[in-house]
C-alpha cells in the first residue's frame, strides 16, 4: 500500500507519533517482533538493574555539589536522577541497537516499501546475513563519532556546579541528536548513503531531527514505554526519510 504521506515535511513530534501508528500496520508487525524482543529483554533487565543502583549513585553524584550550591539541592537532586537515566538510557539503547541492527534495517526497508510502493532488493535471512559485516561497520562508525563527544560531556559532569546544572542539559541535547542519527540512519544505510553524507542531510532539518530525537530520548527513560521504543523510533525515522530525504538519496525506487 502506498503511503498517503504528503511530500511536505512535518515536525519531529509528528514523525514520532507516526512511529506508534506504523509499528502496528498489517504486514509490518512480523518485522517488528525481533527488534521488540531484543529491546524488551535488554532494556527491561538493564533498567531494573539501574533503578537498584540509584540509591548509591545519586548521593555520590550530589557530593560534587559545592557548598555554595547546597541551597539548590532540592532542584539538583532530580537533575542528578535525570542525568543518570539519560546517560545509562542511551548506553543501554546503543547496545540494544547494535544487537538488533540487522533487523532494524529490515524493518525500515519493508516499511519504506509499503509507504512508497517501491520494490526493495531481495531480502530474507540470507540477505541479512550477507549484510551483517556492512551493518556492523556502520554501527561502529556511529559509535566512533559518538564516543569522544560523550567522554567530553561526562568529564563536564565532574566539574563542581557546572556538572550538576549545565551538564544534564547538554547531555539531553546531545542524546537527542545522537538518537536522531541512530534511528534515521537505518533507511539511509539501506540505500548505501555514506555516514558523513547522512549527517549532513540531517543537519539540513536539524530542528525536526532534534524534536524527534528529544521525544525518543524522553521515552527511553520511561519504564514500560521504553520497552517498545526501538521499533517505534525505526518506523518514525523511516516515515521521515520517505517525506524529507528519499527523493534526493534513494538508491532503489
Swiss-Prot record:
Keywords: Amino-acid biosynthesis, Cell inner membrane, Cell membrane, Cysteine biosynthesis, Membrane, Sulfate transport, Transmembrane, Transmembrane helix, Transport
Annotated family: Belongs to the CysZ family.
GO cellular component terms, A-Z: plasma membrane
Function recorded in the entry: High affinity, high specificity proton-dependent sulfate transporter, which mediates sulfate uptake. Provides the sulfur source for the cysteine synthesis pathway.
Biological process, per Gene Ontology: cysteine biosynthetic process; sulfate assimilation
Superkingdom of the organism of origin: Bacteria
InterPro entries in alphabetical order: CysZ_sulfate_transptr, Sulfate_CysZ
Subcellular location: Cell inner membrane
Name listed for the protein in its UniProt record: Sulfate transporter CysZ
Transmembrane segments: 31-51, 75-95, 151-171, 222-242
Protein's gene: cysZ
Membrane topology: Multi-pass membrane protein
Amino acid at each position: 500500500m502506498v503511503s498517503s504521506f504528503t511530500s511536505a515535511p512535518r515536525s519531529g513530534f509528528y514523525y514520532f507519533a507516526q512511529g506508534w501508528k506504523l509499528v502496528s500496520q498489517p504486514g509490518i508487525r512480523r518485522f517488528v517482533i525481533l527488534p521488540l524482543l531484543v529491546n524488551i529483554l535488554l532494556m527491561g533487565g538493564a533498567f531494573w538493574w539501574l533503578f537498584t543502583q540509584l540509591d548509591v549513585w545519586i548521593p555520590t553524584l550530589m557530593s560534587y555539589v559545592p557548598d555554595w550550591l547546597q541551597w539548590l539541592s532540592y532542584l539538583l537532586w532530580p537533575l542528578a536522577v535525570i542525568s543518570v537515566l539519560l546517560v545509562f538510557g542511551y548506553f543501554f539503547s546503543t547496545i540494544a541497537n547494535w544487537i538488533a541492527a540487522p533487523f532494524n534495517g529490515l524493518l525500515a526497508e519493508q516499511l519504506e516499501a509499503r509507504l512508497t510502493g517501491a520494490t526493495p532488493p531481495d531480502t530474507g535471512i540470507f540477505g541479512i546475513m550477507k549484510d551483517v559485516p556492512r551493518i556492523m561497520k556502520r554501527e561502529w562508525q556511529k559509535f566512533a563519532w559518538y564516543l569522544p563527544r560523550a567522554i567530553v560531556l561526562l568529564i563536564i559532569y565532574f566539574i563542581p556546579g557546572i556538572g550538576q546544572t549545565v551538564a544534564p542539559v547538554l547531555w539531553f541535547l546531545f542524546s537527542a541528536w545522537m538518537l536522531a542519527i541512530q534511528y534515521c540512519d537505518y533507511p539511509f544505510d539501506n540505500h548505501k548513503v555514506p555516514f558523513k553524507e547522512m549527517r549532513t542531510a540531517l543537519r539540513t532539518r536539524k530542528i525536526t531531527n532534534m524534536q524527534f530525537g528529544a521525544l525518543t530520548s524522553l521515552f527511553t527513560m520511561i519504564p514500560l514505554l521504553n520497552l517498545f521504543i526501538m521499533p517505534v523510533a525505526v518506523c518514525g525515522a523511516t516515515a521521515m526519510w520517505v517525506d524529507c530525504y528519499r527523493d534526493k538519496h534513494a538508491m532503489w525506487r
